[in-house]
Amino acid sequence: MMLPDGRIECRLCPRFCKVNEGQRGFCFVRQRLGDRMVLTTYGRSSGFCVDPIEKKPLNHFLPGTSVLSFGTAGCNLGCRFCQNWDISKAREWDKLADAASPEQIALAAERLGCRSVAFTYNDPVIFAEYAVDVADACRERGIKAVAVTAGYISDDARAEFYQHMDAANVDLKAFTDAFYHRLCFAQLQPVLDTLKYLRHETNVWFEVTTLLIPGENDSDAELHRASEWFAENLGPNVPWHFTAFHPDFKMLDKPHTSTATLTRAREIARSKGLHYVYTGNVHDREGGSTCCPGCGELLIERDWYELGEWNLENSRCRSCGYEIAGVFEERRGDWSARRLPVRLAAIT
């Protein structure tokens, strides 16, 4: 949007960066060229890898299937604890992989037998045009589109972006505005707005992830408040993943998150009536597995990303018939925990 002073205001995310000719926004990948904002990384990737869908993490979306994952560079948040900082803070585009058109990516996913493509490693909101074009090309081949995102998107852009997505994992980094301001240079409310939008105004399957950082966002008081908001606004059936922090980027002074902390968070969330609460980044079979909210039967056993016992039939518990929220196929996938880096040129 052109402003009276001659600057252009980018309307993609809540930062609403105001830039002069040649300047870039906070994300560094969107640049003013003439009278418009241009995505400078369109068609460029930081690399492609076939992963288990559970790694996104998505536990209730096509379990056991493979997903073709990729990202670009840059980010519209400034998280001091970023676990993918080498990608999200990249400024040298020549280090990105070879160019990849949406059609090439869709064809590669099809030839690799992937049921979905994930926009991940850095936030797809900042490369929305590219992500949308890839999602549309994939849809033509029956392949789903997954966004792994912090949910930091403006009201103007939210509907357009998510109407092209089939699933998402949204990163709820904390439940205080102070945390977002101090450690992410952002705000909490736009993320909460995205979560409510996904739940009440779309058919996008989504799950939520919170990285628990010792001493920053893991207090009982904050976890109780977050869980109460979650139950009231999103309901009991949206999965929530509590994952372990490791020291990285500009936050090297904090210890690793303990399994006990993750278990405590899981118990608090479940005490508020949430049905599907998981732990991640640690070896915890109980915390990673899905149990029936109706009878307590083990439905999907997970050991890291390996699936074990499976007691679902037509999306229902085999023991009591309780319908399990999610997107399930008649048979579970068999990709297992494999990680397969790929070069698109060798496939397409």
Regions found by a protein language model. Give the residues of each.
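Conserved AdoMet/S-adenosylmethionine-binding subsite of the radical SAM
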Residues: 99-260, 265
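Conserved Radical SAM active-site core
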Residues: 32-167, 336-343
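Short, cysteine/histidine-rich loop/knuckle motifs that typically chelate Zn2+
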Residues: 12, 26-29, 74-77, 81, ...
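A generic "binding-loop/recognition-motif" signal
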Residues: 23, 75, 176
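Iron-sulfur (Fe-S) cluster-binding segments and ferredoxin-like electron-carrier domains
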Residues: 16-40, 84-94, 299-305, 324-331
